[in-house]
Amino acid sequence: MGLTSVHVGLDDTDSPLGLCTTFVALAIVREASRIGAGFADLPYLVRLNPNVPLKTRGNGAVAIHFLVEEELVPRVEEAVVRALDDLSERHGKTDPAAILVKGDVPRAFRSVYLRALTEFIPSSYVRSVLERFKGESVKLLYSRSKRPRGLVGAVASLGAYPLEDYTYELIVYRSPEERSESRDISEDLLLELDRKYRPLVFATYDYSSRRVLAVPHGPDPVIFGLRSLDPEILVNVAVDVLEKISHAGYLLFKTNQGTSAHLQRYKPVALVRPYDSVVVRGSVAEKPTVISGGHVIVNVCDETGCLQIAFYKETGRLNRVAKLLSRGDLVEVGGGVMKKDGLVLNAEYLRLIKPALNVKRLNPLCPKCGSRMTSAGKGKGYKCPKCGYRAKEAAKIYRVAPRTLEPGTYFQSPSAYRHLTKPPEILGLRPVDATKVLLSGMWFM
C-alpha cells in the first residue's frame, strides 16, 4: 500500500499569558514520529498580515505535512487533538482550530493564504471556502467553538504549501511552565553565532541599537529563534549550542519569514483599506513634517487620492531618510495601513524612484568682481556690495543643486523588522534545499 499525504494546519493556541503554536507543533511532530509517521517537508511556520487586530503576538500559523500509511492516519489525528488539548491556552483570547487535508491541498486554500498575507479577511469567508470541500478529504479536526477564530490561520497555513520563497528558523524551547521574561542564554553566544554565519544567519542582532533580535521577552516557551537560508547551519548550531544551555527541545521550520511576502501587492491610494499590507506609489505633496516623538509624516498622492505615510522614530534609518524627502519626489512605499483620524500607512520601506530637482533661485554674480549681488530696491535691479557695480537689468539665476538623498531603496533598522521583513543583506540569495536535513532526522528534538 502506498503512502498517503496528510496536511494539518493549526492556529490560535496561545494567549497573552503564554504558550505558542510552534510548541504545539513540536509535540505533534514528536508523537507522530514515535508512531512511525513520515514527513513530506519540514513543518511550516506561516506568518500572515502583521497589521490585523486579532492576533496575540506575531500572527503566525503552523502547518505540518505528513506522509503516512493509511492505517496511521487516525493515530496522527489523535496526536494532533491530544497536543491541542494539552498545550493550547484556556483564555478568552484563545480560539484554536486545526484543519486536516488528505491528499492535495485544495487550490482555493492558496487564495486564502494570499489574501491573509495582505488584508483582514473575516472567518465567514474562510468558512464558505471550507463548505465547498465537505467530506473525507478536508475536515475541521479540532475546535472549541462553532466558529473558531483560528480557522483563518489554519487554512491559510495549508494554502502556503508548497512555499516558493522561504527561509528557515530554528526555535529552541524551555518548559511551557516557565513564564518569566528572562531567558537562559547569553548575548555573547548569540553575537558569536551572528558574526560566524552572517548573512546566511540573519536578523539575530541589531548593531546600531545594540539589541538582540533572536530572543523574545514574553511568557511563551521560546528561548530563542535563529533564522537562516541554510538548514544545515541551523542543525549544526543546534548540536553545538544546545550543549551549553538548558532547554526542552527544538524544532526547525521552513517559513515565509524574511521574504516580504506581505508587501507584494500594489494598490492605488483610493483602494487602500484599514489593516492592508500594501505598496503605494505617488508623489510627495509637501515638505515632510516632524511631529512629537520625532516621527515623520509625509503626504503621498497618486491620481486617485492622497495618503499619510508615517515613518516612526523606531524605524531608525528609515525615519532619518524620510526627513530628506522633497515636494515632487516620486516614491514607492510599502507598509501597513492603520486607522487613526483617517488612514495612515506605517512605512516599512521606501523606494525613491525619481527625486525632484533641487532648484535654487539665486541673486546674480557681479560681472566685475564675481561677488554675489544684492537687491538695489524694488525695480532698481542689483548692486555689488564689494565694488559698488549696479546692474538695473540683471535678474535672478536658477541653479540645480545636488540632492542629499539618491534614488534607491531604503529599509528600517533591524530592531524595527516585522517577522516577514526581508533584510537587505539576503537580497538576491536563495535558500538551500532541506531534503538532506529532513532525511537526517536532526530537525527536531
Curated annotation (Swiss-Prot):
Where would one find the signal peptide in this protein? none
Provide the GO biological process annotations: tRNA wobble cytosine modification
Matching InterPro entries: NA-bd_OB_tRNA, TiaS-like_TCKD, TiaS_FLD, tRNA_Ile2__agm2C_synt, Zn_ribbon_TiaS
Q: What is its EC number?
A: 6.3.4.22
| Name of the molecule in the record | tRNA(Ile2) 2-agmatinylcytidine synthetase TiaS
Taxonomic lineage: Archaea, Thermoproteota, Thermoprotei, Thermofilales, Thermofilaceae
Which Gene Ontology cellular component annotation is one that this UniProt entry carries? cytoplasm
Task: Kindly state which reaction or reactions the protein catalyses.
Answer: cytidine(34) in tRNA(Ile2) + agmatine + ATP + H2O = 2-agmatinylcytidine(34) in tRNA(Ile2) + AMP + 2 phosphate + 2 H(+)
Q: Which residues bind DNA?
A: 278-349
Q: Which gene encodes it?
A: tiaS
Subcellular location per the Swiss-Prot or TrEMBL entry: Cytoplasm
Q: Which Pfam families match?
A: TiaS_FLD, TiaS_TCKD, tRNA_anti-codon, Zn_ribbon_TiaS
Keyword annotations of the record: ATP-binding, Cytoplasm, Ligase, Nucleotide-binding, tRNA processing
**Could you state a single Gene Ontology molecular function term?**
nucleic acid binding
